[in-house]
Regions:
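Pair of pore-lining "gating" transmembrane helices in MFS-fold secondary transporters
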Residues: 1, 195-216
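Helix-loop junctions on the cytosolic side of multi-pass membrane transporters
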Residues: 60-62, 163-177
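Juxtamembrane intracellular "pre-TM" segments in multi-pass secondary transporters
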Residues: 171-203
Length: 273
């Protein structure tokens, strides 16, 4: 809509990834230090929704009126990148840093796989809801995007409010906590890495997987619409997403029964295929 270039999109993806990583480290350590999860999750979801709503105001007519002496298109692109980082900060604070930690706090070896399986299934369901639910919108119209931003904002704000009433604050011991900054750098110490070689090998493998997804997903829809000239690409994506969601949930249950060692090898083999 702002005639953004491929370089602009790459810059936004890179900045968002850095924001998510740094935020998860800083807020995750702060949550551990304070022994609080719920306030970060609820507050983060609410602010996440409000930051999404701000995109409805980043329009060339609005920006051009407020700043007539600069290129409205260029300023809109810059503001989108900045607000994407702000949105990512709130989202990563709530979800990546604190919700995932809360989920780990509330489960054990007998139930963690089932819970994580359902949790991992949700992004797939969300993709289906977004692309399926918004298919009827004319995305070339600004009003359609404004409506979409309002809907998503409302969902997050309501979810954040519900968090205050629906989840319990886990009992986290903070007496023996190290200093805040020691908690942040703990996982990067060479001695810790040497003590947990398998863990860090798997983290490295997952990082490679994450890089591939970040490269693949932004251009998947463009491939469908521009290269294949498909208008009903959701009908292609939907069956794959549904099957992947079901398999993810079932494999989480299998993980609880098989254990980590016997369940991770088939998972990696499937990814390699």
């Amino acid at each position: 809509m702002f005639s953004a270039s491929a370089s602009d999109i790459a810059t936004m993806v890179m900045a968002s990834a850095v924001s998510a990583t740094v935020t998860t480290l800083l807020i995750g350590a702060l949550s551990d230090k304070l022994g609080k999860r719920r306030v970060f999750i609820a507050g983060g979801y609410i602010l996440w929704g409000l930051s999404i709503l701000s995109f409805a105001l980043i329009r060339e007519d609005v920006i051009g009126y407020l700043f007539p002496s600069v290129s409205a298109s260029a300023l809109c692109i810059t503001l989108v990148i900045i607000m994407d980082c702000v949105m990512t900060f709130f989202g990563s604070s709530a979800n990546d840093a604190c919700f995932n930690a809360w989920l780990t706090d509330g489960t054990d070896d007998s139930s963690r796989g089932k819970a994580e399986g359902i949790n991992a299934m949700m992004p797939l369901v969300a993709i289906l809801c977004v692309f399926g639910g918004f298919m009827s919108f004319d995305l070339s119209e600004r009003s359609s995007w404004t409506t979409i931003f309002i809907i998503i904002c409302a969902c997050f704000v309501v979810m954040g409010i519900l968090v205050f009433f629906l989840i319990d604050e886990p009992k986290i011991k903070t007496d023996g906590n190290q200093s805040y900054f020691k908690n942040i750098v703990y996982g990067f110490r060479l001695s810790v890495i040497k003590q947990n070689p398998i863990l860090y090998l798997l983290l490295f493998a997952f990082a490679i997987f994450g890089i591939s997804i970040q490269i693949f997903m932004p251009y998947l829809i463009l491939y469908y619409t521009e290269s294949l000239k498909m208008t009903d690409y959701v009908l292609v994506m939907a069956p794959a997403i549904v099957l992947a969601s079901i398999f993810t949930a079932l494999w989480g249950r299998a993980y609880d029964k098989l254990g980590f060692g016997r369940s991770v090898v088939p998972s990696i083999a499937l990814l390699m295929i």
